[in-house]
Amino acid sequence: MEVREELKEIIEKAKEAAIAAGELPEGDYAAVQRLEVPKSKEFGDYSTNAAMQWARTAHKAPRMIAESIVKHLDTPLVTRTEIAGAGFINFYLAADTVYSELKQILKAGPSYGDLPKNKKDRILVEYVSANPTGLLHIGHARGAAYGSAMVNLLRAAGYDVLSEYYVNDAGNQIDHLAESINARYLQLCGLDAEIPEDGYHGQDIIDTAKNILAKDGKKYLDMDEKERLEIFKELGLQEKLADLKKDLQEFHVDFDNWFSERSLYPDQVNEALKVLKDEDNMYEKDGALWLRTTKNGDDKDRVVIRTNGVPTYFCSDIAYVGNKIRRGYNKLIDIWGADHHGYIIRLKT
């Protein structure tokens, strides 16, 4: 047992002994609330205001209560006590107590102070989840530090926690990645090509194209463009994910699972949409499929399937929430960037 908790029990026993001795009246005494490390060492290793806390119940001055508590303390944990001010009790730990605790710290290692396992809750924490189309920025770094710290704290508190990175490897942004790599590859091969309007212009795209050219040469030039784009999509995704993992590992952030958005299509997405339709949470308008998010306070309903039949990013997000729940997690924590604040109401729907 931690010294602080053990000392609280000792104070409670001293109070009961004082009641049994007739020095304190019987009553509904609250448990010891505060047992803190004083700011100054001269006030001991721990200090409590329990006597002041119990003054109203005991109908006595806090100093008198403190004197009774100190009188009935029976423990080798402390070498001496001191009553200060209006009734604070300061405790000075015995050297053997300190050394014993140090031994426990060394024996337990990083798990020292961890709470017993919580068998009731399973928590999934999803964070960072930057698109695998470029480099991490300072906003991602903030989310990585915050999320990693939260995961570590929850585990220390006894929770069963899974840390997860949601890989956005489906949708238009991955198509634009492939198109951008393709344009840079063609340019490096001496051909005219332009980055698409919604493409990526960073140096990292040029580097990816250079790596492909250095490894495979010009063999992709003879391919049908559609086939070449599919290959560049996979090669680009692999390289970007490898870069993301490397940067995060250097930041001492590791994930238990990297979840692919693609794995949700088509079955899990279709199932999620069916559930929402059956519950009358969706409707068709202007050739698109909409989710009724206004009923939960959103400023407008949101498109899930566009008029051209292409799902929005929100569509797979809906299926992803259901996937987490089906995996047995009853508490979900999503750590997003500041630009995602509008998604909160949508996902709650």
What are these regions (language model features)?
Residues 16-19, 26-48, 53, 60-349:
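NTP-dependent nucleotidyl-transfer catalytic core
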Residues 1-27:
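Generic start-of-chain signal for non-secretory N-termini
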Residues 2, 57-58:
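Short, surface-exposed ligand-recognition loops at beta-strand->loop->(often short) alpha-helix junctions
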